Every structure is written in C-alpha cells, then in structure tokens.
Amino acid sequence: MKKHTLFLFAALAPLTLVSCGENGNTITFAASELPHAKILNEALAPVLKEKGFDIKVTVLDWTQQNAAVARGEYDANYFQHEPYLNSYNADAGEGGALKMVVKAHFEKLCLYASNPQDKTLDNGDSIEIVNDISNIERALLLLKDNGVLSDISKNCYDKDGNFAEFDVNRPNDFVTFADDYSRCTITCIKESALAASLGDYDFGVLPGNTALKGLGDDYASRIVFGENVTEEVLSLRANGVAVRPADATNEKTKAIVEAFADQRVSSYIQKTFGESVVYHYENLLK
C-alpha cells in the first residue's frame, strides 16, 4: 500500500462549484463543503481534466451521501473516514455497501474554546462532543491523552476491542475525569450543530472540517490542543473517496485514485488549508 503524508496549513477561501454536462466523461461527486468539495473543484478537477474527465460536485449533508451513491445518484462521495464507512456498511447490508478506494486527507480533531481569550480548562467547565459512535471514542481519547479524562469505561468496548457501546444521553457515566477536572461535564450533540452550539458550552471537541466551516477565520485562535497525529491515526482516520463496489476498478475510479496522488493536489492543500488538515494518500486499489 502506497502512503504519502504531509502536514498542512490552512486559510479559508470561497467555494466554487464545477458544473458541466453529465456524460460518460463526467464524474459526479457528493461531498461535504469544506474541505472536501473545495479540494475536488480547485485541486482535483484540473488534474482529472488532463485525464479526460470533467467533474460535477454536489454539496450534501454527510448523513445523505452514502445512500445517494449506493442508489446510483453519484459516482462517488468524499467526506468520511474508514471507521464511519464500516459502520454504515454494517447497517446497509450487501446491497447498499460501498468501498473506499483512496484516502486523501486527515482532519485533526481539536479542543476549541468558546472564548478565544480564555483557553484554560477549569474544573466544572462544560465540553461538547459529537454524538455519532464512530467519532465519540476519538473525542474521548483526545481528552484522555491530554489529561482531562483519566479513564474510559471498559463497558464501551466489545469482546473484539471495538468501541461499540455508548449512551449519548448519559456520556458522563462512561468516563472518569481526572482529579483536576472532576466537576467537568460532557454533552453529546450532532456534528452539524457543534460549531453553532459552541457558545452554549465552555469548550468543544470539533473535527477540522466543522471548525473550518463553522468558526470562521479565527478558528485557529480557539484551539486549546489537538490530536497526536501518528501514522496509525492518519491511516485509520484519513478521509477518502467511496464508490459502489462494482465501480471500484472502472476508468473513472482509477482516474480519481491517480489524481489524488498528483503533487499539485498535495501542494494545493498545503497552501490552502490550516493546521487542522493533513494530506495523506493511500491507494486502496493496490
């Protein structure tokens, strides 16, 4: 498996969608707005054009994208990491399952302060995290690795060691806070509401794309700490492109996978996006 990793830096810029006639040479994508659709339109599109393909990108809510590709409404989507796709596939069954064909970038999970002038976590502060099972463990590990939590309940893990059991309505029953933060509390809410709700809490654990889109240009000034990004974490949590299994080796898919390896794509991401984004390429067709 081929891997390239490059740590990147970011600044927001306007999103421009590419539209073109839908035909055999047009690749249709469903994608999240930032950074995914922006990367597709501004970095991948010129590379794919050289390979004989135009692209059409539709920004969809992330909860709709897998089903839309499975129904054949789009050739591919670009928004998710492999653990989320695996969780979706387990529920979708064989007919609705998708296959990830390339990993392209990683979005660092960070703790953000609601008040950028006060980034000290005090005992009794409130913390919001995401409410989907594939990302809850990641948020809890971020807090544990940085000394906020001392333990995550073993009851959260199944016999194979997978994080599988967690009641989003009782998150504090599944964690133990470190002594210095014993009166802190965690609340689980929808990822789409994390940025808008940050003002209702003292701190929030937000994925990179959510912070980029929802916190504005000063998002970086709110960062308290971020994930320790190892090669293992990069590979596990890198966002990639998913297609229907039957399309995994067609010419469109091969072109997508090759295009993401182009130096111009990695350079674009490096120059365009902030410290919350990391370029990480893996060809999953090999």
Predicted regions located by residue number:
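C-terminal motif of bacterial Sec signal peptides marking the signal peptidase cleavage site
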Residues: 15-19
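Short, well-ordered beta-strand elements
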Residues: 24-34, 53-58, 125-127
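Short, polar/charged alpha-helical segment
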Residues: 33-56, 64, 74
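Short helix-initiation/N-cap motifs at beta->coil->alpha
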Residues: 57-67, 159-196
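Ligand-binding "clamshell"
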Residues: 87-101, 114-117, 200, 214-229
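A conserved helix-loop-strand patch within extracytoplasmic ligand-binding domains
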Residues: 97-150, 266
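A bilobed periplasmic-binding-protein/Venus flytrap-type ligand-binding module shared by bacterial periplasmic
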Residues: 108-119, 236-255
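Periplasmic-binding protein-like
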Residues: 135-146, 259-281
